[in-house]
């Protein structure tokens, strides 16, 4: 019984930390598209804020490929690992100055 209560308490804490996905308007989406395209062309580093199952994650890296068919960006992070970002999960993009 104690283990079940602990598991439930932990799940309640996780659920309480979740946020709703912000909605983006067309202008914000267009601005992010331009920023990503420019970063790809000029090899600039970007900071992405991503929505993932109720939580916000940060990824910093350079866009190496845009897969329009799968709606994913291939990003090389600062450790030279490839991160695949679902375009629908992006909630903010800025240059990493």
Swiss-Prot record:
InterPro entries reported for this sequence? YolD
The record ties this protein, via Pfam families, to: YolD (PF08863)
- In Swiss-Prot or TrEMBL terms, this protein is called Uncharacterized protein YozL
Whose protein is this, by species? Bacillus subtilis (strain 168)
Q: Which gene encodes it?
A: yozL
């Amino acid at each position: 019984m104690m283990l079940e209560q602990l598991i439930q308490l932990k799940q309640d804490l996780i659920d309480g930390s979740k946020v709703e996905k912000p909605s983006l308007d067309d202008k914000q989406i267009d601005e992010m598209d331009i920023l990503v395209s420019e970063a790809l062309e000029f090899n600039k580093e970007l900071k992405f804020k991503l929505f993932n199952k109720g939580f916000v994650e940060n990824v910093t890296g350079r866009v190496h490929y845009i897969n329009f068919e799968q709606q994913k960006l291939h990003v090389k992070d600062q450790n030279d690992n490839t991160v695949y970002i679902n375009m629908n999960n992006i909630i903010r993009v800025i240059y990493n100055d």
